[in-house]
Amino acid sequence: MSTIIDIHAREILDSRGNPTVEVDVTLESGAFGRAAVPSGASTGAHEAVEKRDGDTSRYMGKGVLEAVAAVNGEIAEMLVGFDATDQVGIDRTMIEMDGTPNKGRLGANAILGVSLAVAKAAAEFTNQPLFRYVGGASARVLPVPMMNIINGGEHADNPIDIQEFMIMPVAAKNVRDAIRMGSEVFHTLKKELAAGGFNTGIGDEGGFAPNISSTRQALDYILRSIEKAGYKPGEDIYLALDCASTEYFKGGKYEMKGEGKSLTSAENVDYLAALCADYPIISIEDGCAEDDWDGWKLLTDRLGAKVQLVGDDLFVTNPKRLEQGIKAGVGNSMLVKVNQIGSLTETLMAVDMAHRARYTNVMSHRSGETEDSTIADLAVATNCGQIKTGSLSRSDRLAKYNQLIRIEEMLGEVAEYAGRSILKG
């Protein structure tokens, strides 16, 4: 009854209007799962391959018909007849079919779409919500949101070098309150920016993209908005940054054009340490570039005891890259993006490896998203305690927040909000 009888993929659009892969999986029982695959703007060189057609006559070369054909062709032919509850076996079969180290033949977007849709169909077959099916009886921790309220870098058309300025409402009683607190700060920030003469257009992830060039000016606006919304920075709400510094690491230097700075690795660490000394910043993602291992080591030695140092481009949700980082003693947290590695099984393996090494995990969206809310379920399934899913606008971001509210309601009295437990030191 849990046998897969049909797998069908199609090309749909993501939140940036670019094509992506959506997959439907149907079981013999009638159970059904659907998953849409996200895509990133600032992508790590070590990520699994997102297969694009390259046909410039369609979608400027960004079509995904080849990935769709791979699903509807050889993947479906191989997997129809499999038991959907054998997630590991299904994912392993697709990885072996692909036969490359980075899923470059079939495409990680093809493999992941099937992997997630299978999990959803199996969850429906077993009459469980996805978070419970994947995480088991212990899945009950609601994550602290990292809410990206000012966008820069590759996510916005402004001169801000740092890609994401985020707030983390750790003092909330539950995830519902955390989302409310974030919304109140978001709307207060809009008024503050407008009063300062800045535009209030939004970036890819729903945060504002004002024509600010100074990191400190952006942070000051956020602090003022937190206070005017009735909260205390560094007590009720903390700050987090995603530098995405690989994007401005050129020729061995951190070229921060918006700020007019050209920094060595050591100077970049000094720059970030000064920000942490002056602002209540508790998390920095990709503070150093993906292959600047010496810079990462300096950063970890300097700030790792008191600041969460998240590897995104550094680790790319890949157990091999993570193992390398653990052995080198760099970073203390892994950003979890399912499409960086390309299957649910490998994602869960990486999360478990990070957990065993006492690294934290942060479940994350991509800048190119859809209405698919799978990562909300995965955040609870893994009890990771933190989620990055954008700002308090754009339905592609709010779909995840709304799903967290539903999950918290489903869990009832056993639900736990991670809150202050995520703080270091």
From Swiss-Prot:
Compartments, record wording: Cytoplasm; Secreted; Cell surface
Family classification: Belongs to the enolase family.
Residues the entry annotates as binding (2R)-2-phosphoglycerate: Q163, K337, R366, S367, K388
Names of the cofactor(s): Mg(2+)
Catalytic EC class: lyase
Binding site for Mg(2+): D242, E285, D312
Keyword Metal-binding listed: yes
Active-site residues, as the UniProt record annotates them: E205 (proton donor), K337 (proton acceptor)
HAMAP family: Enolase
One Gene Ontology cellular component: extracellular region
Co-factor: note: Binds a second Mg(2+) ion via substrate during catalysis.
Gene3D superfamilies hit by this protein: Enolase-like C-terminal domain, Enolase-like, N-terminal domain
Organism of derivation: Cereibacter sphaeroides (strain ATCC 17025 / ATH 2.4.3)
BP GO annotations: glycolytic process
Catalytic reaction list: (2R)-2-phosphoglycerate = phosphoenolpyruvate + H2O
EC code: 4.2.1.11
Protein name: Enolase
Molecular function in Gene Ontology: magnesium ion binding; phosphopyruvate hydratase activity
Entry keyword set: Cytoplasm, Glycolysis, Lyase, Magnesium, Metal-binding, Secreted
UniProt key word Metal-binding: yes
